[in-house]
């Protein structure tokens, strides 16, 4: 291909109609100028850098789903002889093929899920995507088209929705075909490895050339599947730019499986050729998936980011105006006020309530502060009232009052005398017992008030710890919120690798997806739809690989990894019975703790 930047988004047209197209135009121009300085017309140097980066990322990536090979099959780390060295190199090539193809399948599946979610939305949601979620250039273009069509005809909204549906449908169609081709490739390779595993260990001198020939044929089939995409591309495609050149893989020389053994040089050349074809496949998929992938996060949420940038700029200007750089002390005053408010909140709602609770729990009643009303004061008032009632009754009745007479009995005598005195209030106020009766009632009222205050003081003292806890509630709720956020962050509950409830749900849904694909595979086999069954089996391997990655860490934490790993391998065996596979899926979600629901639901 000609030297050009690996652009994943829109490519500018030659007729520049607005300022938004100038940026990609000049960036493309500068890239071409830089590429022209290289010693060759083809981007070999850039390709080597890209391949080196891809290999580095591949090394960092965790080991993918195991290959269907015998346990004694030598890996790249166990080289004991020339024969085992060639076999180990083949093992490394197979692992790299599986890892790269499954990684590309994952990228395709993520984009496909995005387009399906948008396509299933309402017309308003589709229109919003076309205008606001494809970048500022698309925002200007689609807004202009929408306004012009609204002024000229009444079906502007309908036209926008149809354009959105066409935009999404075309991308989904290409991604589905790419996914089907890669899934078939994975399925065929997996089945061949399952068939030839024993031969690769026992007679590698014959099995290795045969396997390389099979891989060569699989690449040829993949080339034919991808060439179909170029043939059926629509002339009015909404995908910007042109497709890359049709993918052409290098061919191995004709192999005579019953002939003489291959030399080490021929095996090395064949392995290098497989590596080269894999690099071509990755380069082709990076361009094709890049043209049909979901918008990048920056493009998808550019409106939010723009509003955030504008708001941040306004806030920065406002902050600068109130800073010491402009001679203002507002920020220092605000910081001081915030510090004082924080300290006050901590003192009122944390420190003092805790101290009060401590004092209430560990101090004795004798160390308490003096209350509003003491029992001794009430007793003095009660004794004074008793003496006043006794003297009044003895003078009024001219009889000695018994020692066991209650205040209530004497008060009845006072009230009877008081009622008689009220017949002539003026005369009796000056010369009668009316004044003494009033004073006795005042004393009785004073006693009642002091008694009520004493009871209230006792209630307050008894509930002092409750009031202290009530004052500490704001700080308590704030601590609960902070601990919840910290727990979610530590558990990474939003990912399938986490330990929380959401992570467990994601892992169980992966098991459900695996079970559905097992049943779909069996249904296609019974209907004689071998091609569709092959594609579904490849997607089954992809789902198993995803579950294999996300369940490894939690399964190791519960010491269940060896058993879980063996069950996942059994689910991927092509010759295994469907009924047994369904039994294994039930065992996964009912036996292993790493795949069980949350403890609360149990």
Swiss-Prot record:
GO CC entries: mitochondrial outer membrane; mitochondrion; protein-containing complex
Specify the effect of residue 457 to N. Answer: In dgs1-1; gain-of-function leading to a partial restoration of chloroplast galactoglycerolipid deficiency in plants disrupted for DGD1, associated with the accumulation of hydrogen peroxide H(2)O(2) that triggers the activation of an alternative, DGD1-independent galactoglycerolipid biosynthesis pathway in chloroplasts, due to an impaired accumulation of AOX
What does the record say about the knockout? No effect on plant growth, AOX levels, mitochondrial protein content, and lipid composition.
Regions crossing the membrane: 300-320, 465-485
Q: Please give the annotated consequence of changing residue 457 to N.
A: In dgs1; partially restores digalactoglycerolipid content in the dgd1 mutant
Offer one Pfam family short name for this entry.
Answer: NCA2
Q: Where found?
A: Mitochondrion outer membrane
| Source organism superkingdom | Eukaryota
Its membrane topology: Multi-pass membrane protein
The alphabetized list of GO BP terms reads: galactolipid biosynthetic process; hydrogen peroxide biosynthetic process; mitochondrion organization; response to water deprivation
Asked whether the UniProt record includes Transit peptide among its keywords, one would answer yes
Q: Which UniProt keywords apply?
A: Membrane, Mitochondrion, Mitochondrion outer membrane, Transit peptide, Transmembrane, Transmembrane helix
| Matches recorded under InterPro entries | NCA2 (IPR013946)
- Subunit info? Component of a mitochondrial large protein complex that contains, at least, MIC60, DGS1, TOM40 (e.g. TOM40-1), TOM20 proteins (e.g. TOM20-2), and petC/RISP.
This chain's function reads: Involved in galactoglycerolipid biosynthesis. Contributes to an intracellular signal that regulates an alternative DGD1-independent galactoglycerolipid biosynthesis pathway in chloroplasts. Being involved in mitochondrial lipid homeostasis, modulates mitochondrion biogenesis and physiology, as well as stress responses.
Spell out the protein name for this chain: Protein DGS1, mitochondrial
């Amino acid at each position: 291909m000609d030297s050009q930047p690996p652009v994943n988004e829109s490519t500018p047209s030659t007729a520049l109609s607005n300022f938004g197209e100038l940026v990609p135009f000049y960036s493309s121009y500068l890239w071409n100028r830089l590429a022209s300085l290289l010693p060759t017309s083809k981007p070999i140097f850039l390709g080597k850098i890209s391949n080196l980066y891809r290999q580095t990322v591949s090394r960092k990536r965790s080991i993918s789903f195991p290959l269907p090979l015998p346990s004694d099959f030598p890996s790249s780390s166990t080289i004991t002889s020339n024969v085992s060295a060639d076999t180990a190199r083949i093992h490394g090539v197979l692992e790299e093929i599986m890892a790269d193809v499954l990684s590309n399948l994952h990228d395709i599946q993520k984009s496909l899920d995005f387009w399906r979610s948008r396509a299933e939305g309402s017309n308003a949601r589709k229109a919003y995507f076309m205008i606001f979620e494809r970048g500022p250039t698309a925002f200007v273009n689609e807004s202009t088209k929408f306004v012009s069509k609204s002024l000229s005809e009444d079906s502007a909204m309908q036209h926008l929705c149809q354009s959105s549906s066409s935009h999404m449908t075309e991308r989904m169609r290409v991604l589905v075909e790419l996914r089907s081709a890669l899934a078939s490739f994975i399925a065929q390779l997996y089945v061949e490895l399952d068939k030839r595993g024993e031969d690769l260990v026992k007679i590698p001198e014959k099995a290795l050339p045969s396997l390389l020939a099979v891989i060569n044929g699989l690449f040829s089939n993949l080339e034919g599947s991808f060439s179909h995409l170029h043939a059926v591309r629509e002339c009015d495609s909404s995908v910007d730019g042109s497709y890359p050149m049709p993918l052409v893989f290098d061919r191995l020389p004709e192999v005579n499986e019953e002939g003489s053994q291959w030399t080490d040089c021929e095996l090395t050349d064949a392995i290098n050729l497989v590596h080269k074809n894999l690099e071509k496949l990755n380069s082709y998929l990076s361009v094709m998936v890049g043209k049909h992938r979901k918008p990048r996060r920056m493009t998808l949420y550019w409106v939010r980011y723009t509003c955030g940038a504008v708001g941040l700029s306004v806030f920065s200007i406002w902050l600068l105006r109130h800073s010491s750089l402009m001679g203002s002390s507002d920020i220092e005053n605000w910081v001081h006020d915030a510090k004082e408010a924080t300290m006050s909140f901590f003192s009122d709602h944390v420190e003092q309530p805790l101290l009060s609770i401590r004092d209430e729990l560990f101090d004795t009643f004798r160390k308490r502060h003096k209350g509003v009303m003491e029992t001794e004061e009430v007793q003095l008032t009660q004794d004074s009232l008793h003496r006043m009632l006794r003297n009044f009754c003895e003078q009024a009745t001219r009889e000695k009052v018994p020692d066991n007479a209650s205040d209530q009995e004497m008060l009845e005598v006072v009230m009877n005398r008081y009622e008689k005195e009220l017949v002539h209030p003026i005369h009796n106020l000056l010369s009668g017992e009316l004044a003494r009766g009033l004073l006795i009632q005042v004393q009785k009222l004073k006693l009642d008030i002091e008694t009520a205050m004493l009871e209230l003081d006792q209630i307050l003292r008894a509930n002092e710890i409750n009031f202290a806890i009530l004052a500490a509630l704001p700080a308590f709720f704030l601590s609960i919120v902070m601990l919840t956020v910290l727990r979610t962050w530590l558990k990474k509950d939003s990912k399938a690798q986490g330990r929380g409830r959401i992570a467990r749900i994601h892992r169980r849904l992966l098991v459900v997806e695996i079970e559905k694909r097992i049943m779909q595979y069996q249904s296609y086999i019974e209907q004689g739809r071998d091609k569709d069954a092959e594609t579904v089996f490849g997607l089954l391997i992809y789902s198993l690989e995803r579950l294999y990655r996300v369940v490894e860490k939690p399964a190791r934490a519960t010491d269940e990894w060896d058993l879980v790993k063996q069950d996942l391998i059994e689910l991927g065996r092509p010759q295994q019975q469907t009924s047994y596979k369904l039994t294994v899926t039930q065992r996964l979600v009912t036996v292993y703790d790493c795949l069980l629901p949350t403890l609360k639901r149990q």
